[in-house]
UniProtKB/Swiss-Prot annotation:
NCBIfam families: PRK00504.1, PRK00595.1, rpmG_bact. SUPFAM superfamilies: Zn-binding ribosomal proteins (SSF57829). The lineage of its organism: Bacteria, Bacillati, Bacillota, Bacilli, Bacillales. Keywords: Ribonucleoprotein, Ribosomal protein. InterPro entries: Ribosomal_bL33, Ribosomal_bL33_CS, Ribosomal_bL33_sf, Ribosomal_zn-bd. PANTHER family: 50S RIBOSOMAL PROTEIN L33, CHLOROPLASTIC (PTHR43168), LARGE RIBOSOMAL SUBUNIT PROTEIN BL33C (PTHR43168:SF2). PROSITE patterns: RIBOSOMAL_L33. This is Large ribosomal subunit protein bL33B. GO terms for molecular function: structural constituent of ribosome. Belongs to the bacterial ribosomal protein bL33 family. It comes from Staphylococcus epidermidis (strain ATCC 35984 / DSM 28319 / BCRC 17069 / CCUG 31568 / BM 3577 / RP62A). It comes from the Bacteria. The keyword Ribosomal protein applies. GO terms for cellular component: cytoplasm; ribonucleoprotein complex; ribosome.
Length: 49
């Protein structure tokens, strides 16, 4: 079952990205290095509710 998730920057807290994930294959929270436009650099983004 695929669900929509939001990725938030860990440094500034902005929710910059929306994506989907398969809860059966990835039950834990996703962490990705993504670009943050506010900070103008690549930062760690975590899945939020």
């Amino acid at each position: 079952m695929r669900v929509n998730i939001t990725l938030a920057c860990t440094e500034c807290g902005d929710r910059n990205y929306i994506t989907t994930k398969n809860k059966r294959n990835n039950p834990e929270r996703i962490e990705m290095k993504k670009y943050c436009p506010r900070l103008n650099k690549y930062t760690l983004h975590r899945e939020t509710k």
